[in-house]
């Protein structure tokens, strides 16, 4: 009987171990094991022949790696082919919607977290309507603000090679609508971080002054952004956060009262002195800040990732004056050439 068992076992080797997928290009190295159903070993019947194995139950999803890993949805959502007549079209359509919600959530546009992406797709793309609406703050004076999408950077560089704009990066030929945006962009090539946090034992440096001011709220304990839902008291330090109770609600800026804003306790004497200087400077700047907030919408809420503080507007004015002076010099040079041509052509006409 033992020999009768050896033959069937040799003909039916044990199934291979489940495959292992390594994701090398993800932010963290992740090990994912795809589970498969292992059939029960066949038992010997009366005639010595093994019974046919039962059919395997497919438990591993037929998804490629860009569907398995959420942080790659935005990169490969265009590879998904939707079949309008298929029965699972509604289920497969939730994936690109999740990718769009994930991407917009990273941008800080008030989109819901990725867990709510399926319901966002069922609601008819509310996030896209909010992003394109006039009151979303994404467009101002006809000029698009903030950091462009990654897939449009190459087009912007190609456009800059043939553009007549003088606000151009001399390294990558990309053009910008404002001088201060160009200055901030050049620091991505040079690695310069001129704005240093002077809080005791901090020393972090930033590319833009607005990033420094946002960072210093961690030291001061300020939380100027509140949930716009009525009755919700949740406050946040940054404009690109989501209220856990109301993920679809936008955040609005509301300067906290003195009891809330100055509640942060100092760890030592140096920190206490720094906080005292900070609040003294804030009180001196408060009337100016209120006037600016009335005149225009808060730029940090328009684009938290690339917030440009208004104290850099002097650079833009100086750049405009320099360009105006260059245009005047070109005009004077052209007039001088015309006059010289007239003088040299006068003897020929005589």
Curated annotation (Swiss-Prot):
Coiled coil spans: 308-342
A GO-annotated cellular component: nucleoplasm
GO molecular function, one term: RNA polymerase II cis-regulatory region sequence-specific DNA binding
Cell compartments where the protein resides: Nucleus
Listed InterPro entries: Znf_C2H2_sf, Znf_C2H2_type
Compositional bias ranges of the Basic and acidic residues kind: 137-151, 316-327
GO biological process: regulation of transcription by RNA polymerase II
Phosphoserine, modified sites: 310
Record function comment: Transcriptional activator. Isoform 1 may be involved in transcriptional activation of erythroid genes.
Protein's name according to its UniProt entry: Zinc finger protein 367
Gene (UniProt): ZNF367
């Amino acid at each position: 009987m033992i020999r009768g068992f050896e033959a069937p076992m040799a003909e039916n080797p044990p199934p291979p171990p489940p495959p292992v997928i390594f994701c090398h290009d993800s932010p963290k190295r992740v090990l994912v094991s795809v589970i498969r159903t292992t059939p029960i070993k066949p038992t010997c019947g009366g005639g010595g022949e093994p019974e046919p194995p039962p059919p395997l139950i497919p438990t591993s999803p037929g998804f490629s790696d860009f569907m398995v890993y959420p942080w790659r949805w935005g990169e490969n959502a265009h590879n998904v082919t939707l079949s309008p007549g298929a029965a699972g079209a509604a289920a497969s359509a939730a994936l690109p919607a999740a990718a769009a919600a994930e991407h917009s959530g990273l941008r800080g546009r008030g989109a819901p977290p990725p867990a709510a992406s399926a319901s966002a797709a069922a609601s008819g793309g509310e996030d896209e309507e909010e992003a394109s609406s006039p009151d979303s703050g994404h467009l101002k004076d006809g000029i698009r603000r903030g950091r462009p999408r990654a897939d449009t950077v190459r087009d912007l560089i190609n456009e800059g090679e043939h553009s007549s704009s003088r606000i151009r990066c001399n390294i990558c030929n990309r053009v910008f609508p404002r001088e201060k945006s160009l200055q901030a962009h050049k620091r991505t090539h040079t690695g310069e971080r001129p704005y240093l946090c002077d809080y005791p034992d901090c020393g972090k440096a930033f590319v833009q002054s607005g990033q420094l001011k946002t960072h210093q709220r961690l030291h001061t304990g300020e939380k100027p952004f509140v949930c716009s839902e009525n009755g919700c008291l949740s406050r946040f330090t940054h404009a690109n956060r989501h209220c856990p109770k109301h993920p679809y609600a936008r955040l609005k800026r509301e300067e906290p009262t003195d009891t809330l804003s100055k509640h942060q306790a100092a760890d030592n004497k140096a920190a206490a002195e720094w906080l005292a200087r900070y609040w003294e400077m804030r009180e001196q700047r408060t009337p100016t800040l209120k006037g600016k907030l009335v005149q225009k919408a808060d730029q940090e809420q328009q684009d938290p990732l690339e917030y440009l503080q208004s104290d850099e507007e002097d650079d833009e004015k100086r750049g405009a004056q320099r360009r105006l002076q260059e245009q005047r010099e070109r005009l004077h040079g052209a007039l001088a050439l015309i006059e010289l041509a007239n003088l040299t052509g006068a003897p020929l006409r005589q």
